[in-house]
Amino acid sequence: MANEPVRIIGLDPGLRRTGWGVIVSDGARLRWVAHGVVSPPESAPFSERLLHLFEALGVICADHGCEEAAVEEVFVNVNPSSTLKLGHARAAVMLAPAKAGLTVAEYSPNLIKKAVVGAGHADKCQIAFMV
């Protein structure tokens, strides 16, 4: 019996902007469904910005019938405070699909780039062209 198509949401966590994209994976074929950005109000308190990410992504997962989530792994920044804040945002981003019952997997940016472009150190223009 052939595998059924799977609807996957990809998430690129950030406190200011969290990018998301939904695809359908059907064997070796991928089909774009939707994409967007969640931008919490920058003037809101930190905890409210995290809540905004969590709630918005929960709605997006439900609206698009997602079954699995792929989250980009975090890299360590030069600024420890920024890295810690990104870690908080990443936690909210990972919890939203988990609460919705999705399987959540983590992938390194280089692995994602290699899968899309064929090279692990591709730039954003190369990725956009391939998508």
Question: For the regions a protein language model found, what residue spans apply to each?
Answer:
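Phosphate- and other anionic-substrate recognition elements at nucleic-acid/protein interfaces
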Residues: M1-V131
